[in-house]
Curated annotation (Swiss-Prot):
The gene coding this protein: PB1
Main location: host cell
GO-annotated cellular components: host cell cytoplasm; host cell nucleus
E.C. designation(s): 2.7.7.48
Subunit comment: Influenza RNA polymerase is composed of three subunits: PB1, PB2 and PA. Interacts (via N-terminus) with PA (via C-terminus). Interacts (via C-terminus) with PB2 (via N-terminus); this interaction is essential for transcription initiation.
Name of this protein: RNA-directed RNA polymerase catalytic subunit
Pfam families named among the record's database cross-references: Flu_PB1
Domain of life according to the entry: Viruses
Catalysed reactions, semicolon-separated: RNA(n) + a ribonucleoside 5'-triphosphate = RNA(n+1) + diphosphate
Length: 754
């Protein structure tokens, strides 16, 4: 039988079909499986872009160590990205930046950061998400990983009494010199027991908390390991990317560096970090307007919406070390030492390769995973694609980690890399001055906009090429294919579109306009508050807002199957509602959820419909809607709002509490969930209670109710009620016995049906 797709239009109204045309309404694709391939690709790219073969054996780990700074060999290929940083150029750019911002700019920023760091409590490290835990060698929540590290200090040396971030940092540096580190580890022991009845042997796995210890060399590698995962939820990309999470030994030092970089970013007008939202838009607007003030009458500007290719692979920790040394040159010795630790640790990092590579035979009938530590042994089984990835890196791999002295992994030093990017935007030299050209722009991590200013087109070309050359010196590669230039005040920056002023990207907010599905009372009020917010942010014009309101209304009615009382729409729910409406005189006071009409318009978006219709309601109807004793009435302080991108927004619930503010409950039994272990424990507890009660009859113990199916629960309840009625005298003994017999028969039937 053929399926005609146009049949879809017969049974659905237009507004419900909008969701089929809009691609952002579904969840983004998740990545699953092994992340080894993506990690190997990242490492191989980092080594390729270094454009050098200068290597020296590392004294600590005895692995060849590639040099990533001041040693560019392949200078011909101008298209391929370069990650080789020229340190003297970098320091020159930092000096220009300080001159422009005023003498002592860096010193002042570091002093601000220092006062904050000295007060900082080390529990701030629990704020992160997933963190690599070096004791169990897998990812854990940040708070757990921190606790396990503190436990390791306790096992080796005694309790950790520090409270501030500095004391924690000092302890981490001490730890790197310890000859042996002890830590807690959960091990599973297999216990064998003989069953007395059958005589068979039963194996049970018992988790036991033990204490493990590792030597100095092994601990160093674990401390410097960065775990990798595949990035989740990326739209419009076929290939996945690897993201990284460092361990709890590197975290405190990177936190300190980011604090210093944040203080600098706050004062740079070209930086898009760390502010966000409307504040960010205002900051960018001032940068654009100040550009117009700097231009002469014969000059004009071109906007380049830029894209940097392979930002992370071309960032070098050695370059960061030099930059931080320059930033802290006039500061205290404490800050000089603290800021140098994080880049040095990243210069010696090991990257965890993940689960391994999956193989299948030619018929695709069998699958096997080669674990990361055994890849060298079985490389003859790999496909060509994997072999070409693995063989150049073989000399850097130790067990399941790979030594990577250069390159950053995704999401490490966002603020510091912004400082590095802004330093190129501050560049000025004699040749540019002579031609009457200059540039400025905006930078936010790897995203940037360039405003090139000159008096004629050939000079504009020259200026842009000059900018590209300056960037190449410090490992920033502007992608010439993906960047595009346009007329003044037309650009895109961090998903914000600018055309004289910021134009909203309404597509991202569309899913929030739809019915949230909480309940009839909250849904429409929540949608109205979102439309109101978007009108305040200049995202919606009045006519578009009115259209959005009408679409919300249509979808609300389609979701809850409630249509206007005079629409003559037939349906199971409308039958009941129409009977109820006949009893009401003033039909203007009906709520939308009871078959009423829309009373709100753009000027009354902030007023809930219950308030507007309050005066027009019949007294009887009003008392029924706003009845505090009604069991359905319930109020939530906040409401979750879903968006196409970014996290779920939690907003204040402005809805008026009425009979429609009900909360639906899901009925789930424990039997089909992962609570079975809990149930087994409860049964054991019940057994112990019964034994105890049989010995000590006067003991006051509350025995657990135990696991019950719904059928058993109903029987138990009925018996209890019948007994209570008999005690009061509402029913006689003969009736009580009859009820007991009926329940016994039902129980028997239920057990037999199993």
């Amino acid at each position: 039988m053929e399926i005609n797709p146009y049949l879809m239009f017969l049974n659905n109204d237009v507004t419900s079909l909008i969701s089929t045309t809009y691609p952002y309404t579904g969840p983004p694709p998740m990545s699953h499986g092994s992340s080894t391939k993506y990690t190997l690709e990242t490492i191989k790219r980092t080594y390729d872009y270094s454009r050098t073969s200068v290597e020296k054996t590392s004294k600590v780990f005895n692995i060849p160590r590639r040099k990533f700074c001041n040693c560019l060999e392949d200078k011909d290929d101008l298209v391929k990205p370069t990650g080789n940083v020229d340190i003297s150029s970098l320091l020159g750019l930092a000096e220009m930046m300080e001159k422009r911002m005023g003498e002592g700019f860096f010193k002042h920023c570091v002093m601000e950061a220092e006062t904050e760091i000295l007060k900082m409590h080390f529990s701030r490290l629990t704020e992160g998400r997933q963190t690599y835990d070096w004791t169990s060698e897998r990812n854990m929540p940040a708070a757990t990983a921190l606790q396990l590290t503190v436990d390791a200090i306790k096992e080796t040396e005694g309790p950790f009494k520090g409270t501030t971030m500095l004391e924690y940092c000092n302890k981490m540096i001490e730890m790197l010199d310890w000859k042996e580190v002890k830590f807690r580890k959960v091990k599973t022991m297999v216990r064998r027991e003989k069953d007395k009845r059958s005589g068979k042997e039963i194996k049970t796995k018992v988790p036991v908390m033990g204490i493990d210890s590792i030597k100095h060399d092994e601990f160093l590698i674990r401390a410097l390991t960065i775990n990798t995962m595949a990035k989740d939820g990326e739209r419009g990309k076929l290939q996945r990317r690897a993201i990284a999470t460092p361990g709890m030994i590197v975290r405190p030092f990177s936190k300190i560096v980011e604090t210093v970089a944040q203080k600098i970013c706050e004062k740079l007008k070209e930086s898009g970090l760390p502010v966000g939202g409307n504040e960010k838009k205002a900051k960018l607007k001032t940068t654009v307007t100040s550009l117009n003030a700097r231009m002469n009458s014969d000059q004009f500007a071109v906007n380049i919406t830029g894209d940097n290719s392979k930002w992370n692979e071309c960032q070098q920790p050695e370059a960061y070390l030099a930059l931080l040394a320059y930033i802290t040159k006039d500061s205290s010795d404490l800050m000089k030492d603290l800021c140098s630790v994080a880049p040095v640790l990243f210069c010696n990092k090991f990257v965890k390769l993940g689960q391994g590579i999956r193989l299948s035979n030619k018929r695709k009938t069998k699958e096997v995973i080669i674990k990361a530590e055994k890849m060298g042994k079985y490389k003859n089984l790999m496909r060509e694609e994997y072999k070409n990835l693995f063989e150049p890196l073989e000399k850097y791999i130790q067990k399941d980690v790979c030594f990577l002295p250069g390159g950053m992994l995704m999401g490490m030093f966002n603020m510091l890399s912004t400082v590095l990017g802004v330093s190129t935007l501050c560049y000025m030299d004699e040749e540019l001055k002579a031609k009457g050209c200059f540039w400025t722009g905006l930078q936010s991590s790897d995203d940037f906009v360039l405003f090139a200013v000159a008096s004629n087109w050939s000079n504009i070309h020259w200026t842009i090429r000059r900018f590209n050359a300056v960037c190449k010196l410090i490992g920033i590669n502007m992608s010439l294919e993906k960047s595009y230039g346009s007329l003044p005040e037309l650009f895109e920056f961090t998903s914000m579109f600018f055309d004289g002023e910021f134009v909203s990207n309404l597509a991202m907010e569309l899913p929030a306009f739809t019915t949230a599905g909480v309940n009839e009372g909250v849904d429409f009020t929540a949608a109205m508050s979102i439309i109101k917010t978007n009108m305040i942010n200049n995202s919606l014009s009045p006519s578009t807002a009115l259209m959005a309101l009408r679409i919300c209304l249509q979808e609300f009615r389609a979701t809850y199957r409630v249509h206007p009382w005079d629409s003559k729409v037939k349906g199971g729910r409308m039958k009941i509602i129409n009977e109820f409406i006949k009893t009401i005189e003033s039909k203007d006071g009906l709520l939308i959820a009871d078959g009423g009409k829309l009373m709100n318009n753009i000027s009354t978006l902030h007023i809930p419909e219950e308030v507007l219709k309050f005066e027009k309601m019949d007294e009887q109807y009003r008392n029924r809607v706003f009845n505090p004793k009604n069991p359905f009435t319930n109020f939530d302080k906040t409401i979750d709002i879903f968006r196409a991108h970014g996290p779920i927004r939690v907003e204040e619930n402005e809805a008026v509490v009425s009979t429609h503010s009900f909360r639906t409950r899901a009925n789930r039994t424990l039997l089909n969930t992962d609570m079975r272990a809990m149930m087994a424990e409860e049964k054991r507890y019940q057994m112990v209670c019964d034994i105890f009660k049989s010995v000590f009859e006067s003991a006051d113990i509350n025995p657990p109710i135990g696991a019950m199916s719904i059928g058993e629960a109903i029987e138990e309840k009925l018996l209890e009620r019948a007994k209570m009625k008999r005690d009061i005298g509402a029913i006689e003994d003969s009736e009580y016995e009859e009820i007991k017999d009926i329940i016994r028969d039902a129980k028997k039937a239920r057990i037999e049906s199993r």
